[in-house]
């Protein structure tokens, strides 16, 4: 069993592997501010606010409408405590508009779910890591890979990595 929830002492979960590539790109491009969008309970938004705070980068999160559950309340509080600027986007269309309007020189856009080709390299890399562990005899070849999904970016990247490996 892979335990990506233990991948970082700051914030665990599948975003850590994605952000390894995304944040490297941010610094390579000399960006000084992060803009992202997501639901009120977005774990990607939480990861962004926490990693942004740790790196000294201002973060703006444009939230789209979502039921306010206990988890959503905790996510909002976590983002606020990390210093993120929280913007109410409302419906999806207005969220897209407000996110676009938030971008200016120096801004780095992280898509909802951190789901894009660059971020997906994190989970293609995870499949290579898994294959290496199997080849070294550290674990048996898995019969199945099970994971929760939101934007399905992780699922797509794992499937791509698995197809490359055969």
Provide a role label for each language-model segment.
Residues 1-166:
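PLP-dependent amino-acid enzyme catalytic core
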């Amino acid at each position: 069993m892979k335990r990506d929830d233990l991948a970082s002492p700051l914030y665990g979960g599948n975003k850590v592997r994605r952000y390894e590539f995304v944040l490297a790109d941010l610094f390579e491009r000399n960006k000084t501010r992060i803009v992202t969008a997501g639901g009120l309970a977005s774990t990607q938004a939480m990861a962004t606010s926490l990693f942004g705070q740790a790196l000294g980068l201002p973060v703006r999160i444009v939230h789209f409408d979502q039921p306010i559950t206990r988890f959503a309340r905790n996510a909002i509080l976590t983002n606020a405590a990390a210093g993120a600027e929280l913007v109410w986007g409302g419906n999806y269309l207005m969220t897209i508009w407000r996110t676009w309007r938030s971008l200016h020189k120096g801004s780095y856009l992280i898509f909802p779910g951190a789901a894009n080709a660059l971020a997906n390299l994190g989970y293609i890399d995870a499949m290579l890591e898994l294959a290496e562990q199997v080849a070294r005899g550290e674990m048996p070849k898995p019969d199945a890979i099970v994971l929760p999904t939101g934007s399905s970016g992780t699922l797509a990247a794992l499937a791509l990595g698995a197809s490359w490996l055969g």
